[in-house]
Amino acid sequence: MSNPPTYTTSQGCPVSDAFSTQRISGTKISIKTPVGPLLLQDFKFLDSLAHFDRERIPERVVHAKGAGAYGVFEVTEDISDICSAKFLDTVGKKTKIFTRFSTVGGEKGSSDSARDPRGFATKFYTEEGNLDLVYNNTPIFFIRDPTKFPHFIHTQKRNPATNCKDANMFWDYLTNNPESLHQIMYLFSNRGTPTSYRKMNGYSGHSYKWYNAKGEWVSSVHFISNQGVHNMTDEEAGDLSGKDPDFQTMDLYKAIEQGDYPSWECYVQTMTLEEAKKQPFSVYDLTKVWPHKDFPLRHFGKFTLNENAQNYFAEVEQAAFSPSHTVPGMEPSNDPVLQSRLFSYPDTHRHRLGVNYSQIPVNCPMRAVFAPQIRDGSMMVNGNLGGTPNYAGAYNCPVQYQAPIKASSKTPEEQYEGETLSYDWTEVNEYDFYQPGRFWEVLGKTKGEQEALVHNVANHVSGADEFIQDRVFAYFSKANPVIGDLIRKEVLKKSPRGASKNKF
C-alpha cells in the first residue's frame, strides 16, 4: 500500500505504537523492565479494552447462523394486473436487493449443514421504501397458531437442565401438536439437509395480499433456484458438520467472488378471495400448500446475487428483516402466524440493534424517509431531521400524502363484524394428514427418498424414551400407516426394547 492509513485512537489522535501501555518505571530496583501499575490516563489502551468488552451484541433467538450477499432483482413479466407495486411496473426494471440465508434452531457457531429449515430473507431497496420478503426454504411450517411459537422453539433448542439437545423434548412437542407433521416430513426427508444455500428454493409459506385498483388477490410466492435443488444424506450432513461447519457460508462467498453468481426465478400463485373461501383448507394455514394444478405458478422476475458483503458484522449480522416492511400493492394476510411476526421481528431488532436499527446502512431505505415523530433514541446518527418539528401537521412544515390505492367497489373485500373472542387453533382434522400423505407419495417418485425419510427419523428418534418413540410411530402413521410401521422397525433394530440407554 503506497500510502497506508495512520494508526489512531478511536477519537482520531495519532499514536506511535499499537501495543505499548503507560506504566510506572521500575528503574530504582534491580528489575530493569517497568513493573509498576498501569496508568488510568492510558486512553489508547483502556478505550481499546472497553470496546472489546462490548463487541458482541445479542444473537438472534432464531436464525442466528447465516450468510448474506447483495444482488439485483429484474422484472421479467408484467404482473400489473394483480399488483400495483412500482418496482414491478415495468418489464426489465431492476431493483437492488440484499439476501440473508440462515439455519433456524442453531446458535451463531453451529453447523451450516444441520437438519433444519433454512431462512431465506430478501430486502428490496425500492423507490417506495424497503420491502422485506422473509421466507424459508420450506413451503410450510410447524405451527399455525402463533401462541405456540415460543414453546415450539424451546423444544427444538437445548434442555434447560443439561444444556444439550434433547430428543424427548423435540418429539414430545411435535407428537402433541400433529399439525406439524407436514413440515416434519419435509424436514426429515433429504430436503432438510441442502448441500448449499445456492442450491435450494425459497417460499413465502404464508399467504399475502397483492392488490391494485381493480381488486386484491391472495398470493403465495416461490423462488426457484437456477442451480437446481441438491441435498445431502443424513450421514453426509453429519460428516460435513464435523469437518467444515461453515461450509455453506464459504460456498456462497466463494461462488460470488469467482463470478459464479447464483440466481433464482420468482413465481407467484394467486387466488381471489372467493376462491379462497372454497378451498378444503384455510389459505391462512401455514401448514398447507396450494395445489399447483389448481393455482399454477406465474413467472414475474429473477434475482441474482453478485456482490459479497464487505464486512460480515456490519452487513450480515446487523441486517434486519421484517414482513411488516411492505410497499403499496402488497400487504400481510390474516394468517395469524404472519400477523404475530409483524410485531415480533421489529421488536427483536430494537432489542438486538437498538431503536434506530433502520439507520444502519444495510437496513436504510434508498429513498428519502420523512417520519417527523420518529426522533431521538439510542444511536440516532442521521441528523435527527435537524430543527424540523417533531410531529406531523405542524403549521411550519407542510407535507404531502400519497392517496391509497382503492379497489373497485364491485370487488369483494374482507369485512368483519363480531365480538372479541379467545381462540386457539388447536383442532386437527383429516385434511391435516392428507397433504403429508401426498408428500409421501411424491417422495416415492424418486428412488431412495422414502427410505431416506424413514432412516433419518429413526436415527433421531432412537435417542428418545420408548414411550416417546411409540407416540412418534403413531404420529407418522396418521399420514400413512406404512410410514409409522417402517420407522418402528428401523428404530427397534437400532435400539432394541429393554436395552439400557445412557442418556447422559
From Swiss-Prot:
UniProt KW keywords: Heme, Hydrogen peroxide, Iron, Metal-binding, Oxidoreductase, Peroxidase, Peroxisome
Motif Microbody targeting signal, residue range(s) on this chain: 502-504
Pfam families: Catalase, Catalase-rel
Active site residues according to the UniProt entry: H63, N136
CDD domains assigned: catalase_fungal
Top-level taxon in the UniProt lineage: Eukaryota
Cellular compartment(s): Peroxisome matrix
Any GO CC annotation of this UniProt entry: peroxisomal matrix
Entry's EC annotation: 1.11.1.6
Role played: Catalyzes the degradation of hydrogen peroxide (H(2)O(2)) generated by peroxisomal oxidases to water and oxygen, thereby protecting cells from the toxic effects of hydrogen peroxide.
Family: Belongs to the catalase family.
Name by which UniProt lists this protein: Peroxisomal catalase
Organism field: Candida boidinii
The gene coding this protein: CTA1
